[in-house]
Regions:
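Ligand-binding pocket scaffold of soluble enzyme catalytic domains
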Residues: 27
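Metal-dependent nucleotidyltransferase catalytic core
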Residues: 1-23, 31-39, 45-100
Length: 113
């Protein structure tokens, strides 16, 4: 992992750690798989409460690109918001491509035991 990714990940944790509707933040994508380039984006899954997910869905924000806090050339956060129940179902019953998407994923922060 490049230093700019480490810094961006710390910024991402800071962004969500005090939000009680965020249960966990999980690193995915090329960085989690060890295939990153210096300009790779930071892919993250933000695990939220069902109520937060419904609001994000209603606002059409279950995925979003965020540039704030990811300040290297070409860098941004590619965020996907899911519930814990969705991720459990994906792990148990998801297609191979869905399960592969989470392979090597790494929990960055959790408040869920």
């Amino acid at each position: 992992m490049y230093p700019q990714h480490e810094k961006a990940i710390q910024n991402l944790i800071e962004k969500f750690k005090n939000d009680l509707e965020v249960l966990a933040v999980i690193l995915g994508g090329s960085i989690a798989k060890g295939l990153e380039r210096p300009d790779s984006d930071v892919d993250a899954i933000v695990v939220v409460t069902p109520e937060r997910y419904e609001r994000q869905r209603d606002e059409r924000r279950i995925t979003e690109c965020v540039f704030e806090g990811c300040d290297y050339p070409g860098g941004y956060f590619d965020l996907k918001y899911y519930t814990k129940e969705y991720l459990e179902a994906a792990a148990d019953h998801g297609s191979e491509p869905t399960q592969y998407a989470y392979m090597h994923a790494r929990c960055l922060f959790t408040r869920d035991p």
